[in-house]
């Protein structure tokens, strides 16, 4: 089934574990864009969780049952290889399947795609006149080798430096709520073991976008058995070689916290989003137990953290108190 009109923002969901965090992600988009059409596409059976039911009842988004075969069938013949790859993916490969569907939907109707663990904190910039828009994220420089199965990455001196830095920041966040300032001190040397990579958790395009068409064409050339091969790795490689008019945002806009430090959103009371932040990627896959347990009375985050602040702000929004902000 297609949305009645072209959505301005859309999410894709499959599975039953629709948590409070994901409902808040949808609500925050509507909060900052009250006139926008927000769609949640559901693949397979609708979730039965109370949070999904709340989403249905509060009217912040249109929920649309999505038929992958129909969506992929609308792709031009030259891009039909993406449908072939999708059909070969195991049903449990939710992330890889979602990657392909988001590209197909963007190609079909354009708009802004967001992962359900992306929390909007400000109004999105005007993207008129661009073919597509994407954000860069700070990642460990050895991660691509790791996910491809290259075990020699663990013997690299930069990997040892990264592991020590991670451990120091993790201990400060867990034991001292970030008050020792370890992350700020280490960031000065982070260029030695990190690099910038495009991520597809936030992705915008016009209909029939050249960039998205190039991404869809590239799906048939990757090894879909390798994690991220249809996601960040693919969009980064395409971005590196495209001549399309793509607006590229720095990490401060969507990914101000590196995925390997996403625990700080729940634990570090000193971390603040930059003024330029439009959204923050929680990387919920790193916090599955915590995200599953989150409730209105227990945000599973320390008071003073970004997540706690957004939870409080969302509660205020639900009570009609106005615009959501976060520290």
Positions of predicted regions on the chain:
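Short aromatic-hydrophobic micro-motifs that form the base-stacking/packing surface
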Residues: 112-114
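Glycosyltransferase-associated regions of secretory-pathway enzymes
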Residues: 1-98, 116-327
